[in-house]
Amino acid sequence: MCIRDRDNPEVILESVDKLRQKMEENAAIDDKFLDENFEQIANNSNIPFMGSNKPKVTIIEFFDYNCGYCKKSLDAITELLRSEYDLKVSFRDYPILAPSSRTAAKAALAAKLQGKYFALHSALMNMQGNLNDEKIYEAASYLKIDLNKLKKDMQKINIEEILLENEELARKLNIRGTPTFIINGKIYAGALELSKLKTIIEESMNDS
């Protein structure tokens, strides 16, 4: 009887070992890249942020406006910014879930040019269900954002470049989903509750 390699336990174990080794090698590369480039990544003037200009702890969030777990994280992030921690939270749009994710990301970045990024960001994050163009522009209109200017600014090459940079950065860091947080140079994949975020922040401050 012929046995296919994939049915051979020894071959399967060998494949698993190779995969594990490859993942460890990739993680080492990711860590090295992040160590060497964290300051530049954290302080990119094109990326919207809230908090201190000279923080003790920097949080970078990769998010998607259609991501339910990202929406849940908004409350925790907002609460952290109200706390006594000396923080900076940098928001990296990573629109991977739907075409409307990219539209929403462009709209928020364009709203930044009218001083309304965080207002629109919060409105989009608090919306229930999947986004569409109508919902996005209704939210912008409600916030008294100039829609004609917004739509023109959404087409600007520098806004597309921000999204492409975020996507390239996510690729280099092996970030595959949202939300993903980078906290003082360490990557945390998935949603983090407020208590967990506080623990990570306090440990990071003690280490610095």
Residue ranges of model-derived segments:
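Cysteine-centric redox/oxidoreductase cores and disulfide-bonded domains
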Residues: 95-178, 182-208
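Extracytoplasmic thiol/disulfide redox context detector
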Residues: 4-99, 152-177, 202-208
